[in-house]
Amino acid sequence: MRLLALLLLLSLAQAQRLGVIGDWGADTPGRAQVAALLRHEHAQRPLTALLTVGDNFYPKGAVVETFLRELPPVPLYPAFGNHDAPRLWEQLRRFLLERPYYRLRVGGLEAFFLYSEDGLPAQRAWLEKALQASTAPLKVLLLHRPLYSSGLHGGSPTLRSLLEPLLRRHGVALVLAGHDHHYERLEVQGLLHVVTGGGGAGLYPTRPPVPWSRALAVAHHALFLEVRPEGLLGYALDPGGRLLDRFLIPTRP
């Protein structure tokens, strides 16, 4: 983890632009295409780091170094999903992490990673303390299972009841998740949620959009986040570079 932090500090001398992928680590053309998109974007304007929302390696979590080598040469900070669970210990060791939940500061943004497969009550207690201690103007939560989604899995009522009051109380600006293999932006009482599960695994159709849905695409993609003085700019691109969605979250005063 110290080595990753050092690499991140070195890359902060450049623009603070993050790539986000989810449900990506499958031996498919989609994964290779998204990896090529990330390399292209990094060559155009360097990425500070890559973040994931889990399902990093299919089918049972065993690390595939070839997949990692095809990504841009920047630090990678993962969340972990249900497909990672059988080999979670291996991934924690590979990414130099002591546990599957942690926090990461990138300039004016602080990212909080949770493990949605197990141990949520203890993680909630940790998250509350971490959010209370955070001085970041922009707070982002990453986890695998979404709170809201129009996908076949759908949103988790358990996660909503456990986390929503906490997220609102501490001014979290964005929740990033995967699990459903599509792109979707939703807004629920002012809190933005993005499902970014199109990193390479097979796509599947969605249900009719839920009332909070603001943008939806069944496509492989990567999400990009730019930390700017005026706020957090987000945009999703498909492997051909086509813009699927764009949003701006203003920095809180």
Language-model features, listed with the residues they occupy:
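A short C-terminal boundary segment appended to hydrolase-like catalytic domains
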Residues: 214-253
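Extended active-site neighborhood of metal-dependent phosphoesterases/phosphodiesterases
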Residues: 39, 58-139, 153-174, 180-228
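Secondary-structure transition/turn motif
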Residues: 25, 114-117, 195, 235-241
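Sec-dependent N-terminal signal peptides
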Residues: 3-12
